[in-house]
Design a protein with these regions (language model features):
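Generic structural signal for short, flexible, solvent-exposed coil/loop and linker residues
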Residues: 14, 21-25, 65, 74-77, ...
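Short, surface-exposed "cap/lid" segments of acyl-processing enzymes
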Residues: 31, 37-98
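Alpha/beta-hydrolase active-site loop
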Residues: 99-129
Length: 130
């Protein structure tokens, strides 16, 4: 199994152990990994958005996969005891090789806060609000 797939399986297990449902959502031009535990739709929801992950392998070399090796936001979401919790990965994180091939490295480097990225994460947040 490739490292990115191993990291995805590990993240899914972490989420499931906390009663969260792992899914991949289409948002804008991206596929976004999420983990959600929502017991009451009227409750406020605690939202954790992952950081940049492994954007760079060295100071001058871009990573081929931005999936974090230690997912801090996911770890916090899993430990949160609130009944409604959502974890949102950044674009291009936790994708298999085929989907990752469609994700340009600029989205985890120079364009990580571009309109396309912000729009995609906003779409996921909007879906959570419904």
């Amino acid at each position: 199994m490739l490292e990115s797939e191993q990291l995805m399986v590990l993240a899914q297990r972490q989420a499931h152990s906390a009663g969260m449902t792992w899914s991949l959502r289409e948002a804008g031009v991206f596929t976004i990994a999420t983990a959600i535990r929502r017991t009451n739709l009227s409750d406020r929801i605690h939202v954790y958005i992952e950081g940049d992950g492994r954007a760079w392998t060295t100071r001058s070399r871009l990573s081929t996969d931005p999936t974090p090796r230690r997912a801090t936001a996911l770890a916090l979401a899993v430990k949160d005891t609130h009944p409604s919790v959502a974890y949102i990965a950044r674009p291009c994180q936790y994708l298999g090789p085929a989907a990752l091939a469609d994700c340009a490295p600029q989205y985890w480097s120079s364009h990580r806060y571009s309109q396309a990225v912000i729009k995609a994460i906003s779409e996921v947040l909007d879906a959570l609000a419904k």
